[in-house]
């Protein structure tokens, strides 16, 4: 499919992304969809197609591949890393979004390294945040930038939790500091607490 050929996100995680996208619509959660780490746009297109045509989608990527991992990312990441790894293009993203019938006007590409683009991003409320950023510093910056903007009942999804040491460490530290570590579902996503218990009827990863 157009989605699978333009992403390295697993099938089970794509199904969960779709379910969460539908959930923010049915629950009327306010805000944009934001994805940090876009590659060729497969998961971004899925999120855009699964949400309302009125909901704006912001996609953050350098389109130069992953940055070099740091000390907190562990030996495996540093030994496997190659320059240009996971590099897509803005054209790839536009093409797959169009194939899924998503209007260009909904999709906003924010090109550049996170440390350059995220601090300057306007404080839009966020309904769903998908972090596919692999390394400790990148994931930590995404969380510190966007967490306060996520609406109550909104979803934060971590693609690389449990796969890469740096991502796992960044997520554990961030959530634990806020008493949210036990709300991490299947090591994959967390729903920002609201007044009611937002853990009811949440989709499970296979």
How does the language model describe each region?
Residues 19:
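Short internal alpha-helix immediately C-terminal to a glycine-rich phosphate-binding loop
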